[in-house]
Amino acid sequence: MLYSYTEKKRIRKDFGKRSQVLDVPYLLSIQLESFQKFIERDNEGQHGLEAAFRSVFPIQSYSGNAELQYVSYHLGEPVFDVKECQTRGLTFSAPLRVILRLIIRDATTETPIKEQEVYMGEIPLMTENGTFVINGTERVIVSQLHRSPGVFFDSDKGKIHSSGKVLFNARIIPYRGSWLDFEFDQKDHLFVRIDRRRKLPATIILRALQLSTNQILDTFFEKVIFHLNDEHIQMELVPERLRGETASFDIIANGTIYVNKGRRITARHIHQLKIDSIDRINVPREYLVGKIIAIDYIHDNTGEIIVPANIEITLEILDKLGKANFKRIETLFTNDLDHGAYISETLRIDSTRDRLSALVEIYRMMRPGEPPTREAAENLFENIFFSEDRYDLSAVGRMKFNRALLREEIEGSGLLSKSDIIEVMKKLIDIRNGKGEVDDIDHLGNRRVRSVGEMAENQFRIGLVRVERAVKERLSLSDLESLMPQDIINAKPISAAIKEFFGSSQLSQFMDQNNPLSEITHKRRISALGPGGLTRERAGFEVRDVHPTHYGRVCPIETPEGPNIGLINSLSVYAKTNEYGFLETPYRLVHNSVVTEEIHYLSAIEEGNFIIAQANTNLDDKGNFVEELVTCRHKGESGFFSREKVHYMDVSTQQIVSVGASLIPFLEHDDANRALMGANMQRQAVPTLRTDKPLVGTGMERIVAVDSGVTVVAKRGGIVQYVDASRIVINVHSDEMYSGEAGIDIYHMTKYIRSNQNTCISQKPCVTLGELVERGNVLADGPSTDLGELALGQNMRIAFMPWNGYNFEDSMLVSERVVQKDCFTTIHIQELACMSRDTKLGPEEITSDIPNVGEAALCKLDESGIVYIGAEVTSGDILVGKVTPKGETQLTPEEKLLRAIFGEKASDVKDSSLRVPNGYSGTVIDVQIFTRDGVKKDKRTLEIEEMQLQQAKKDLTEERRIFEAALFTRIRHVLGSDITNIDIVKILKLKREDWSQFNIKDNNKYCQLEQLAEQYYELNKVFANKLEEKRRKITQGDDLSPGVLKIVKVYIAVKRQIQPGDKMAGRHGNKGVISKINPIEDMPYDEKGIPVDIVLNPLGVPSRMNIGQILETHLGMAAKGIGDKINKMLKQHKNAEQLRQFIQKAYDIGDQVRQKVNLNLFSDQEILLLAENLKHGMPMATPVFDGAKEKEIKQMLQLAELPVSGQITLFDGRTGEPFERQVTVGYMYMLKLNHLVDDKMHARSTGSYSLVTQQPLGGKAQFGGQRFGEMEVWALEAYGAAYTLQEMLTVKSDDVNGRTKMYKNIVDCNHTMEPAMPESFNVLLKEIRSLGINIELEKN
């Protein structure tokens, strides 16, 4: 395998056996592609903004004499870039401009056409990492898994009716519009509901579709024809129809008895009747009784109906028909087995007789209480299902609809037709008759994914429809000649709809920015909740459960614990959505029992037809199956199939899991419940100050780190020309350069930015000067990455043993070394904001002149009243001094005297400064001031602006210098290498005709020089414009919300070391709280004197069944052992060849591993660099379901000269005695989770009280108290601590007078209390009185 220069720095040993046929796709593509589809011009008009515009335009006036047409749209450039939007609290968006054409049709004059570009609001843009910046915060739009439009056949599984009878139903769900339901009741009548309203007999909708009773019966039933003769009745025989019936008379034909009376008619009888070609048999008169007439029988002469259709035959009716001389009677063919008379019976309970009465009935159901007119009834019915404005099945819906009805074509109209409705009813009746199956609603073929683009398009369309109504009104005005398109369109409704969606929709979520993995997982999340989806309360067990079709599409492991379990899922690693929005997963094609490299993506529906082998099936070198019988999946079931029958094979072993779960090594040895916790807890890991790659990984770490966008990745290959903490400059390879450009790429680092979760985002370069980089190489590490690999935690030396009860119940004993080495030290950045508003009494003022505040409290503020950068602040310190004017109050004589002496100012303002909240402390790292346009800027603001300007100037000058240097180098190629930069500048300033003195004979060179001179002038122009633009942005006033004059934001950074009470976890769901930080000398140590870092409880393993952690510990020990051996060799100054041989030996361990590392291709310098990076441990990759085997782990331990059992003798640090038994010791990757004791620790003496009960509030956010609940009261009762109990229930809780007296007593050093009536007792009295029961308290 070929490695690039940066990849050679540290190669992860891979134990994977299966070849990688398909690379992991770009992990954020679901978001980026969907949004791209939304904003890209689509000439077909199928997707995005174009589709929305075409669906609403053209808009015609009510009279039809004016029309507003849509021509085209384009998106402008955003005013501010992403970083500027984040600092200013703005939305990163682009203006949408649409060209509209107004046509006024006038019979008298020529038709004037006015065309104009109209502004239609701002469209938020997606950043390159798949997020949106809305009001300065990064948000993610989560994709939604909703029920696909189409038709679904279902049953109630016998739950609705007490008899347990299964009632079937069908539901037509459009993409937008009214739902149409058909359902059977317990009497087998078929009903219809529109939008889940009151049910009506289903035949009403058929009558509304202009079908008569005869046509309805014709459509749904076959007919049986009887011929009446004078002496007997003959029936036209279709033998198949007799199957399973009991003969009620002897079946005789041509003198032969085929079936005796009372016998069941079997297949043999039918076969005999067919052979003998019997087409008529005689039947007794009684046989016709109970049969149903199929058509109206009308008197030839009078035209009156003698016998109407759908009537049961009686002997009287037979006589009537005989008298009227009807020789042929048509009846409906029904039976109890597979031809139920459901529609016939429904017709009998249907009170309507014609189309009008059916339409009126539907109108009454949809609009109860309104008087129906013919026109209104017809319009309503037409609009419900047959109007393009109100109803759309969409391409997906039509495809699903036609597939469900087994039609050939899958495209068609978005509206329902008469035949659609009839066929759905027919299929539902077939299912009731026992032919066909109901659909599985949880099958992924019936659920589709709606991503950002589609949801934004729907919102945009809603906004456009609101605009349409207003436009129609305006087009009907008389003075149209004077109007232009922009006077007719008001863009507010569109902006409002878009803003509401991105700002407050349930699926627009505050991005989880704890670490790179949590970002990626959030963007790949799929939720069944949200508008048009399920609700937590109504979602049953089936919807939440893992379904066979989830395989390779949705992760069966990663889902939240709690009420959302199973409703929020994660996309599998290789899954993608197809054009219809259904999830697909890739498979390798198997051709004649040979597995090919050809990849096919299959949706859940397509997959059902194939037999698919698992990814871990053994193949020979040519891709043939080794075993005769192969483990495969078919129609959701697993089993053995012969290799000739296999159609496809899985692409990878990690195909079924999500990104989060694919990062858990030895996942295959963990119980699913613990794996779920492990996958979820990795997302809560806080980025540590010093990152450390996992010794035992899965090989997905690099992919996640690069795709998450937190690292800086080279866009083009080249040589590192300059590198410092804030920028990297790459001199691009000539073959990757565009013509006429300088060939320089500059990458800027992000420094100490606050994330959404208050963690710290900072990037640091991981390349050195002169290094060769290629496209896609990592140039700088971000938070939680180490040399371009995801590094969420730290490798800790752990031992599984009890230690004096300090690791009881999952607690952890941690060594002081971990604190000293800053292993789990994290930086947290808090943002605090102070607003100065314009109040009724005057503006609030930000100042250092605050009434009644001493000098000491103001010592950290500058003269503008704002804290200076670098100040160490603790809770209660003033960050921004602010005074608010207060209304006139009645002054006491003393105050009047003071005002007379000291002037007005002191008492007409009150202190409303921004202070550090309780429990926070840290260092001020940044201050930002935003001033409204037109408000005078204070001194500090001007200083900050000046500083930003100088920085921008410096950066741009430096950038320009770099580009200039590259240009000058190319000019030297033309003019000769001995020319100086000063001369070059002089030459470029000369006129073209003065160049003749340089004797440039070559015309080609002359052209080159001309081109370079052009570039030089262009460069100067571009940088002058950039600087001017920067200056404008820095000095312009800010657009603040109404009434706000100034906003000051202060950022405080705090360094948090690990301490008892912090929550930590491994990657296998093994979580716990630190119980004690132990001195290093007291920790257990091994024979070499190396102490362990963390002691875990061995009882945490067997019951949890997450054995993966033990295997990780062993392999981690081997990885560290090999690193130690390399370190030892480096210390002994062994030469590169010896190092090469030893490292090669480590890479060669393992049977049939896919990774082939040939260190002979590495130079000695590269080997030494590799060894330097491996000396702290050789990182290993053990991919999910394809990981290291026990034998391989033992080989690694042997190479590291460690005991193969993985257990060693430990000694007690306090006594020096060896422990009785050997202990499992090794290296495990531990994470510090974002549940820090500092954020949870809280104490209160006095504070706020609840208004009604007068009891202290609860919770840290409200600065509340600790609840003394009923169980605690029982505890005090049990010990008879009556006075303590009285104090708890009165003065410490809600006895208002008692607690104020208590203050006074404490001040007077009188330690007694006088408890009175608790306020909550008064509340109880009032509640009882509200029930009408009077209670009086008697005082004795």
From Swiss-Prot:
PANTHER family: DNA-DIRECTED RNA POLYMERASE I SUBUNIT 2. Keywords: DNA-directed RNA polymerase, Nucleotidyltransferase, Transcription, Transferase. It comes from Baumannia cicadellinicola subsp. Homalodisca coagulata. This is DNA-directed RNA polymerase subunit beta. HAMAP family: RNApol_bact_RpoB. DNA-dependent RNA polymerase catalyzes the transcription of DNA into RNA using the four ribonucleoside triphosphates as substrates. InterPro entries: DNA-dir_RNA_pol_bsu_external_1, DNA-dir_RNA_pol_su2, DNA-dir_RNAP_su2_dom, DNA-dir_RNAP_su2_hyb_sf, RNA_pol_bsu_bac, RNA_pol_bsu_CS, RNA_pol_bsu_protrusion, RNA_pol_Rpb2_2. The keyword Nucleotidyltransferase applies.
